[in-house]
Design a protein with these regions (language model features):
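Membrane-proximal helix-turn-helix segments that form the acceptor-binding/catalytic region
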Residues: 20-21, 47-66
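Conserved donor-binding/catalytic core segment of Leloir-type glycosyltransferases
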Residues: 112-131, 137-140, 151
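Short alpha-helical donor nucleotide-sugar binding micro-motif in glycosyltransferases
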Residues: 183, 192-197
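Aromatic "clamp/platform" in nucleotide-sugar-dependent glycosyltransferases that forms part
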Residues: 205
Length: 278
């Protein structure tokens, strides 16, 4: 069996080569939210890109199983290719799950909402273009945190250093409420942050199917996220959180301030079944 993550050009070459060597072998590709744009466009392309386009479609014939994580991408693929390459027979909607087996080994005592703290967290590679940490910091500029604390978990890019210094120069009092804790590699220590927190914030410009959202939902965090396919699925039409327009830090600040002020109910997991993402 050949399993590849992401349907890239390299994946296409691996699949074709594998099928040449082992025609009866099984090939599977987990998209992880990513599909090369050349799948959906062949007009006005250079000769090299047109060749890549043909390679992708030849590969689509050879793939035996194609898993997608979000309903949006599943629908797009199904609609685009329903009449070709037996796509409906090989396309499977398979969202990322949560590792319950690891959780059982860590002796984490899960907190219900009444025992959680007034904490908002985010996690990821802080300062990268994808994660758009600046959007969160710009929102924090406008917020009165009161008795709430915000923890930013993850490695910090060099590009973010200047932005951080400027942020704390403008907001010296927030040194007592906004914390950069660095990357946490120990799973128990990381999950304890989710366990303590009431709110998880994600400001990414784009994502595949981020595991941080699955973890946030598993630990019953109210999720405030930019508009992403995975967020739309996990929030279930706003039941477990709110979607914020891309780049709109003012909207993010206003919504989070309403949470802090107690104007929005974030205790939304009363009837939630953890098996839904396990």
């Amino acid at each position: 069996i050949l399993l590849r993550i992401h349907f890239t050009f390299m994946t296409a070459l691996f699949v074709l080569l594998y099928k040449m060597i082992n025609p009866k072998g099984i090939t599977a590709v987990k998209l992880d939210g990513y599909l090369d744009p050349l799948f959906f466009s062949s007009d006005s392309l250079s000769l090299f890109k047109r060749l890549k386009h043909k390679v992708f479609f030849r590969t689509l014939r050879q793939v035996d199983l194609l898993t997608v994580e979000t309903q949006c991408l599943y629908d797009r693929l199904y609609k685009e290719f329903i009449d070709v390459y037996d796509i409906k027979l090989k396309l499977v909607l398979m969202p990322n799950g949560f590792d319950e087996e690891t959780l059982k080994t860590l002796s984490i005592v899960e907190k219900d909402f009444g025992h959680k703290e007034n904490i908002m967290i985010t996690a990821g590679r802080l300062g990268t273009y994808q994660k758009n940490t600046e959007m969160l910091l710009n929102a924090l500029d406008l917020m009165e945190l009161r008795d709430w604390k915000v923890y930013l978990i993850g490695s910090i890019s060099e590009d973010l250093d200047f932005f951080l210094k400027d942020f704390f120069m403008r907001n010296p009092s927030k040194k007592e409420s906004v914390f950069f804790v660095g990357p946490i590699y120990d799973k128990k220590s990381l999950w304890e942050f989710y366990n303590r927190a009431k709110v998880f914030i994600l400001t990414s410009r784009f994502e595949g199917y981020p595991l941080v959202l699955t973890e946030a939902k598993r630990f019953r965090n109210y999720i405030v996220s930019t508009e992403l396919d995975a967020s739309e699925d996990l929030l279930e039409n706003g039941k477990y959180g709110c979607l914020i327009a891309q780049e709109n830090y003012k909207e993010l600040a206003l919504f989070c301030q309403k949470i802090i002020n107690g104007e929005i109910c974030i205790d939304v997991y009363e009837n939630y079944d953890k098996e839904d993402i396990s």
